[in-house]
């Protein structure tokens, strides 16, 4: 590597050094741009609960120093000679994965998120053996396949959360045909994912009911996000009154909860999609079978549907509700994420604060 390449590849970032999860300034080296790569200056990065999990080694597989961040938005500064879809100056996004085998049935169908050899954007092991570093950094180099075009008139700070929170609910909603005007949707939980499910539901022409254990969420659900109904899920009478009334349910709740009361809300042949991660699922087979209901899980989405979602949000002027912060506030922000003290997604202003 030449001295000029060395300077070009140097990357400022914030990293966790140990399971305390405390982040502080750090410097890493990004790879040089190869034939199919895109290098982008990161302007914004969303803050996801995954950043807490791996910064604090909650799954026991964190590799330090760890640079979080997989909701990345920025501007192209360099492209490899074979790159066809991007040019310098384009607005681009990078989501939860940055590589895959590109040969399996899932990759061939644009479902790279399901590839057995997929590589996470941070704390992953790339195919060259290196550990991936995420978007709490000044720039990143990614194969063009895993980059997304952000429409030029769509704010970069708004695009960032779409690349995890947005696609996590958009993908299953599209997969299970939850875009039928006039149908009814229930959204369980009103955080980063839940508020996007409400926004998509409204854009699809659905009648949306929000379920929460907190009455404090009522005003924002109805008046801020435009849901038609709000239900306290711990209120037996409210839940009973809605039995067999919903076509679809999207469960974004992160904590453990009973499933049967929600399953009873679905009409015959209704669909319940789980995108949260409770420690276990317990459900009555009769509730599932006799109602001919479907229970499905989902994660994020492949490259094809992620690009579709970005275009849809731009066309329909759908924007996540965000709080923009400087990177110097990230440790405080992560604590607030744990405490659910955010409406509804933090976005780091990398461009103006990472110096």
Curated annotation (Swiss-Prot):
Expressed in the vasculature of the primary root and elongation regions. Expressed in the hypocotyl, cotyledon veins, vasculature of the first rosette leaves, hydathodes and at the base of the trichomes. In stems, expressed in the vascular cambium, interfascicular cambium developing xylem and cortex region. Expressed in the style, the vascular strands of the sepals pollen and anthers in flowers, in the abscission and stigmatic regions of siliques and seed funicule and testa. It catalyses: (E)-cinnamyl alcohol + NADP(+) = (E)-cinnamaldehyde + NADPH + H(+); (E)-coniferol + NADP(+) = (E)-coniferaldehyde + NADPH + H(+); (E)-sinapyl alcohol + NADP(+) = (E)-sinapaldehyde + NADPH + H(+); (E)-4-coumaroyl alcohol + NADP(+) = (E)-4-coumaraldehyde + NADPH + H(+). It is an enzyme of class 1 (oxidoreductase). This is Probable cinnamyl alcohol dehydrogenase 1. The lineage of its organism: Eukaryota, Viridiplantae, Streptophyta, Embryophyta, Tracheophyta. Its cofactor is Zn(2+). Involved in lignin biosynthesis. Catalyzes the final step specific for the production of lignin monomers. Catalyzes the NADPH-dependent reduction of coniferaldehyde, 5-hydroxyconiferaldehyde, sinapaldehyde, 4-coumaraldehyde and caffeyl aldehyde to their respective alcohols. Keywords: Lignin biosynthesis, Metal-binding, NADP, Oxidoreductase, Zinc. Its EC number is 1.1.1.195. CDD domains: CAD1. Pfam families: ADH_N (PF08240), ADH_zinc_N (PF00107). GO terms for molecular function: cinnamyl-alcohol dehydrogenase activity; coniferyl-alcohol dehydrogenase activity; zinc ion binding. Pathway: Aromatic compound metabolism; phenylpropanoid biosynthesis. It comes from Arabidopsis thaliana. InterPro entries: ADH-like_C, ADH-like_N, ADH_Zn_CS, CAD-like, D-isomer_DH_CS1, GroES-like_sf, NAD(P)-bd_dom_sf, PKS_ER. NADP(+) binds at residues 168, 189-194, 212-217, 252, 276, 298-300. Zn(2+) 2 binds at residues 101, 104, 107, 115. Belongs to the zinc-containing alcohol dehydrogenase family. Homodimer. GO terms for cellular component: cytosol. The keyword Lipid biosynthesis does not apply. Disulfide bonds: none annotated. Binds 2 Zn(2+) ions per subunit. GO terms for biological process: lignin biosynthetic process. Zn(2+) 1 binds at residues 48, 70-71, 164.
